[in-house]
Amino acid sequence: MPAEPLSPQEVEERLATLPGWSLDAGRLTRSYRLGSHFAAAAMVVHVAQVQEELDHHSDLTLGYHTVALAVHTHSAGGAVTEKDVELARRVEDLAAGHGAH
């Protein structure tokens, strides 16, 4: 069963619980700064593991000391769904362990 798109109000309510996340071009987005390129790469691997577990994948970008994510649900016509919010929450939970801010 495809995920249902969240309404604009629901997206705003979910974003209020996800500090640092925003809506950009219809996708949930967040950038993290880390202490080193190695720490950023380790976080990318950890995020990839979570994405595989959830069977939901973001656009994930590794920079010099940064990691950036952008996510929406393709099966919902590119809308934001609870799947995106769950991925964002899981990434937030693991980010601190990598020293991300």
Curated annotation (Swiss-Prot):
InterPro entries found in the cross-reference section: PCD_sf, Pterin_deHydtase
Sorted UniProt keywords: Lyase
Reaction catalysis annotation: (4aS,6R)-4a-hydroxy-L-erythro-5,6,7,8-tetrahydrobiopterin = (6R)-L-erythro-6,7-dihydrobiopterin + H2O
EC numbers on record: 4.2.1.96
Disulphide-bridged cysteine pairs: none
Signal peptide boundaries: none
Domain of life the protein comes from: Bacteria
GO molecular function: 4-alpha-hydroxytetrahydrobiopterin dehydratase activity
Class in the EC hierarchy, top level: lyase
GO biological process: tetrahydrobiopterin biosynthetic process
Family: Belongs to the pterin-4-alpha-carbinolamine dehydratase family.
Protein name as it appears in the record: Putative pterin-4-alpha-carbinolamine dehydratase
Lineage: Bacteria, Bacillati, Actinomycetota, Actinomycetes, Kitasatosporales
